[in-house]
């Protein structure tokens, strides 16, 4: 049974101690999708390993998330929504939205919690999409 999200507090210090490892799926060695999976696991939802996500096109990622992994696209992010970054129609990064910021990990800076605008200011030609997990927000209408 899923934990009550209103009672759950993100332990940011725990994640900020993790280090970026390509393909990392176990704390403290996480890549960006590994971090998303670990956060969801801590709130009671199991996400797929999705090893090859870096090779996904926007269409494939959206189709996979919506159909297979019980996500749906949203335009106004809420806490625990997944934020996905695409460049030239290719998925290259994901993170977790929390309190209008992003929790994410990258190869050159490990894990951090910062305004989304900080990440976008260093990148050109990026498309951002937000996805909500139906397992966590089952009480809302889609």
What are these model-derived regions, one by one?
Residues 23-26, 84, 112-118:
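Charged, low-complexity, helix/coiled-coil-prone segments
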Residues 1-72, 86, 92, 134-141:
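N-terminal capping segments
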Residues 79-82:
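Loop/turn positions that initiate beta-strands
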Residues 71-72, 91-142:
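Aromatic- and glycine-rich peptidoglycan recognition patches
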